[in-house]
Amino acid sequence: MIRPSAARSHADTLAEYLKERLPHHRRDTLRRVAEVLFGILQAESTLHRKIALHIEREATPASITRMVARTFHETNLTPQDVCDVLLPLLPPGRLTFVMDRTNWKLGQHDLNLLVLGVALGGVVLPLNWKVLPHGGSSEMRARMFLVAQLLERLPASRWAVLIADREFVGEEWFSFLRGQGIKRCIRIRENTQLDALPAHDAFQNLKPGEVRAVFEDVMVYGSLMQVVATLSPQGERVLVASDLSVWDTLTTYRLRWNIECTFSAMKTRGLNLEQTHMHRPDRLSRLFGLLSLALAWMVRVGEWRAEQQPVPKKKHGRPAWSRASYGRELLCAALRWGRTTFYTHFELLKSPFSAPGRKKSQPVRY
């Protein structure tokens, strides 16, 4: 159990920082946000009653549960607010951005989130998102809207590249990104036309692990781009169109996996986003914003902890824990037992991640 004085101190500390970053919000509102954020971290749940169990207040459990509900129902916490809180975590220089979508069902409701974020610490930190009103693919206008909004806070000079999967294609979309000065690294479908030739005809008889590229840029959805292909160990042909060099295209595209790690840490393997009973777009968006703050903090603490004490490895050589789990363990111990180490972890929320290293690779053409 958290000592009441420690709980109040920790919530007040975070609320004061949030007030610095978000001066247009009321201090008491931000304190509730801080309390709910701490509750989510400790409960690993998005159910109101489970979050309420970890909030120390002189009130009945039912009253605290209603307070948690009001935080999601009434607090006008926008994606832009979350982005403003997370900006100090971004290292200087050019950054790699990833766009993807995650969806699930709640009864008869399709819950569908389009997410744009930055690749750091082995995950993608969400900086902007939109709750889609259906269960299918994203519309081009929604993608363009997210990018345009984020460009207001992070100009194109900070964007090294935007990575996306096969869903995120189209002539207008490719033209928009080029017009904004954003380099693209986007997987394309096998039936995509490269000049006048279907992509699958241009890359026949690929062997697993083999990499091939066109000898010169070709027209892809109205844009001249490099196209690189490989065959996965499972036998799936992977074709990527990009504005990067041949030998950097696939290396960069592999970073798209980071957003799968994000969704995993937010959903069943982490904070359990899918447990929520909320389906209204505004409330779901606020919940996702709080989970984004929690994830960023967990990963930042996990990165710091790994520098002090590397993550143990299992027999197959993979890490025993993700950076998010590694950081959450320390955060929860500090919150639960009122430890002063909380303030060390709190300072990490205000300090940038290490600049992502870029592995060099040798150019190979086929």
Q: Model-predicted segments: where are they?
A:
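Acidic-basic catalytic patches of nuclease active cores, encompassing PD-(D/E)XK
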Residues: 90
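Single, function-defining residue in the core of a domain
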Residues: 1-46, 53, 57, 75, ...
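An active-site-proximal beta-strand-loop segment
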Residues: 100-113
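Major-groove recognition helix of helix-turn-helix-like DNA-binding domains
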Residues: 61-74
